[in-house]
Amino acid sequence: MSRIKRGTTTRAKHKRILDQAKGYYGRRKNTIRIARQAVEKAGQYAYRDRKVKKRSFRALWIQRINAAVRAEGLTYSQFMHGVKLAGIELDRKVMADLAMNEGGVFTAIVAQAKAALPKAA
């Protein structure tokens, strides 16, 4: 039985890690032990931030809608309540886009939401 040396597999593993660490600063790009840690941490950040990205965009849409709605004399929560009562089925992403780019259309939606709100006694 001949002896098996694992040089080729080790080199392939190292090459894969160093390719992923391309563009990193200092020894992170060319020292395997440090590059492995950096690539691992980068993967953890990427996984976490794919979740955070969804929250961040939702918060951005809410801020944009809130700013546009306050110019019309409503708060965000009042507007969303009016939208629900009026039966308007647009999500926050679309409404934020309308508020930014199609002011007239958004003003019409705000008017519908205002009309659907119950009058204060």
Curated annotation (Swiss-Prot):
Pfam families in UniProt: Ribosomal_L20
GO cellular component: ribonucleoprotein complex; ribosome
Highest taxon, organism lineage: Bacteria
Annotated GO MF terms: rRNA binding; structural constituent of ribosome
InterPro entries: Ribosomal_bL20 (IPR005813), RIBOSOMAL_L20_CS (IPR049946), Ribosomal_protein_bL20_C (IPR035566)
Keyword list, A-Z: Ribonucleoprotein, Ribosomal protein, RNA-binding, rRNA-binding
One GO term (biological process): ribosomal large subunit assembly
Coiled coil: none
Family, per entry: Belongs to the bacterial ribosomal protein bL20 family.
Purpose: Binds directly to 23S ribosomal RNA and is necessary for the in vitro assembly process of the 50S ribosomal subunit. It is not involved in the protein synthesizing functions of that subunit.
Record's protein name: Large ribosomal subunit protein bL20
Native species: Sphingopyxis alaskensis (strain DSM 13593 / LMG 18877 / RB2256) (Sphingomonas alaskensis)
Organismal lineage: Bacteria, Pseudomonadati, Pseudomonadota, Alphaproteobacteria, Sphingomonadales
